[in-house]
């Protein structure tokens, strides 16, 4: 079963500036990774709620929400279920070394990107 929202990825014109803005709203830096060159993960101060993953836009990308990711316990099973239900544009599952997670990306009927994610730890 697909669980709660794990994270919301935002592509910003300046990741550091966006992370500082979220800190002003009460979010705390969870970790910084080399994902997308440099990425910040921020969580609510009370730990209750999804993370924001922030990175600086590259190339022809434009600032905005890149995707919303949902936590899962068994990514292989959920990916297979999505394929059987003919969900569009499934890519994955695949492991991302820089985050220690396995992800599958897919799109909604309007082409927006969604993701399921499983911690590998």
Regions from the language model: what does each represent?
Residues 46, 73-75, 109, 120-121:
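Short loop segments at secondary-structure junctions
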Residues 52-55, 114-115:
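Conserved beta-strand in the GNAT
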Residues 6, 30, 66, 90-91:
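A short, local hydrophobic-aromatic micro-motif
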């Amino acid at each position: 079963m697909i669980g709660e929202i794990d994270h919301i990825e935002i592509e910003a014109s300046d990741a550091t500036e966006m992370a500082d803005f979220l800190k002003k709203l009460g979010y705390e830096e969870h970790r910084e990774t080399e994902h997308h060159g440099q990425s910040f993960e921020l969580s609510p101060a009370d730990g209750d709620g999804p993370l924001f993953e922030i990175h600086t836009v590259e190339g022809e990308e434009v600032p905005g929400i890149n995707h919303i990711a949902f936590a899962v316990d068994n990514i292989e099973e959920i990916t297979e279920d999505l394929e059987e239900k003919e969900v569009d544009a499934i890519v994955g599952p695949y492991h991302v070394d820089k985050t220690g997670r396995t992800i599958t990306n897919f799109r909604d009927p309007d082409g927006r990107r969604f993701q399921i994610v499983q911690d590998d730890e």
